[in-house]
Amino acid sequence: MSTNQKTIVIVDDEKAYADFLTAMLTETFGCPVRTFHRATDALAELAGVNAGIVITDYHMPQMTGLVFIQRASKIAPGVPFVLVTGNSFHCDDHAVGPDLPLRAILTKPFSWRKLADEILRHAPDLALKPGRAVGMASPDTPA
């Protein structure tokens, strides 16, 4: 594995859900996936991770996903973020701020294809594993 290889980072306090995402992303993409169940742990270690994209939950016990993104973007400038939430969520440019690297908001349940498309759109250097297509096994598998 190349030391320059980008990593997909997942930050979600729901262990079963985060582990499911990790398994699906590992199976689909040809890059490492790093999972954190606590936002503070992710912040402490993010500088040492060559992140290609960060997927974070909105509702977490220590801080919201938006607060996490604000802090993490200072540690890992230029890395895109995808926010995942179980509730309908709306934020405009004023709530998020023009400098926040939030690239997409996905409301659970969303299709696996939608998440993979967002990853490929905002982190095009993260490649699918050879022979894999987005949603190859089940394109509408809820994530």
Please give the residue ranges for each predicted region.
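CheY-like receiver
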Residues: L126-A143
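Acidic catalytic/metal-coordinating carboxylates
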Residues: H37-R38, T64-V67
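Two-component/phosphorelay signaling modules centered on CheY-like receiver
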Residues: K15-R34
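Receiver (REC) domain active-site loop signature in two-component systems and cognate sites
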Residues: M60
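Active-site residues of response regulator receiver
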Residues: D57, T85
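C-terminal output helix
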Residues: F110-A123, A127, G131
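Acidic, metal-coordinating helix/loop segments flanking the phosphotransfer/catalytic sites
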Residues: T35-I53
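Alpha4 helix (beta4-alpha4-beta5 surface) of REC/receiver domains from two-component response regulators
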Residues: V67, S88-I105, R113, D117
